[in-house]
A protein has these predicted regions:
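Aromatic-rich carbohydrate-recognition surfaces in CAZymes
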Residues: 2-138, 159-178
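Structural transition elements
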Residues: 154-157
């Protein structure tokens, strides 16, 4: 996959240090994809062995792009469109939105490129609002319900320390971005 966001989150420090403008472009491309809408439906391969499952079920199939949902990647050699990963429905993943927000803020802290921050602002807010919709009434964290984070082969249920800590960090980073942009 091209620029798998979850792997990029951990591996992009060297790119940031050596080619910060390229890192900024990657943040903008993810921002464009986060704001995109593509209603083409696709079945997620994790569930391909359930050909008779009732549809539509967001675990089984769904639209390619939903505004605010942070995608997995910017395409692949076999599928040039963003979010080529189709094993799981990544629109349910709880860790991608805060990772994106943290990377946008990190880029600004390193480069002081306020224009890049401005260019990504709408995607930052849309991503956090999308994830906030997954917080159940009376709860403070988006709960996990199986394989809905980037540890996609490990199932967890309820409050995840991993996703919860990213949620808090993402909220703080989004607030800092709002403060920086006035």
């Amino acid at each position: 996959f091209f620029n798998s966001l979850d792997v990029y989150f951990y591996g992009s420090f060297s790119l940031m240090a050596l080619m910060p403008r390229l890192d900024g472009v990657v943040m903008k491309r993810f921002g464009d994809a986060i704001l995109a809408v593509n209603n083409n439906r696709r079945r997620h391969h994790e569930y391909v062995n359930l050909p008779y499952a009732d549809l539509p079920d967001p675990k089984l199939e769904g639209p390619r792009a939903v505004r605010g949902a942070v995608i997995h990647d910017l395409g692949s050699p076999f599928d040039a469109e963003p979010d080529a990963y189709d094993w799981h429905n990544v629109k349910e993943w709880k860790d991608l939105a805060p990772k994106y927000v943290l990377m946008v803020l990190r880029h600004y802290v390193k480069t002081q490129d306020k224009q890049n921050l401005q260019d990504c602002k709408e995607a930052v807010y849309a991503a956090m609002q999308y994830l906030e919709k997954m917080v159940n009434e009376g709860e403070n964290f988006p709960l996990t319900h199986g394989t809905d984070d980037t540890f996609d082969n490990l199932s967890s249920h309820g409050i995840s320390v991993y996703c919860g800590s990213l949620w808090i960090a993402g909220l703080r980073a989004a607030a800092k971005i709002a403060e920086l942009l006035g």
